[in-house]
């Protein structure tokens, strides 16, 4: 099998079956491989049936050949040019808003200080349930 189909080579195949996880492509009369759903096209593929049908002729690139298991991993996406990415505007970071009473000049609170504050708050009469 490895002598017939080299990793990195591109072949023409015929889609013989579709599953939720990918498409089976016949490379010749006795050999077929699997194109995983993530390798069908650039971008997200929700339903493989929207992109492929049984009987379609497709160009596939061999990603891996597993001699022991007799499996060939294929990719249609690797034979296609990647779409151009839109230039996005750089985002401005949001300024952090820290209340002055909740932090020390260094920017953090010690547990000791917060504990004393919590005890004072719990002793306030307007918070005590009747």
From Swiss-Prot:
It is found in: Cytoplasm. SUPFAM superfamilies: Nucleic acid-binding proteins. Residues 8-77 form the S1 motif domain. Residues 76-109 are annotated as: Disordered. The keyword Protein transport does not apply. Residues 100-109 have a biased composition (Polar residues). One of its GO terms (cellular component) is cytoplasm. Keywords: Cytoplasm, Stress response. Its main location: cytoplasm. Pfam families: S1 (PF00575). Signal peptide: none annotated. PANTHER family: 30S RIBOSOMAL PROTEIN S1, S1 RNA-BINDING DOMAIN-CONTAINING PROTEIN 1. This is General stress protein 13. The lineage of its organism: Bacteria, Bacillati, Bacillota, Bacilli, Bacillales. The gene is yugI.
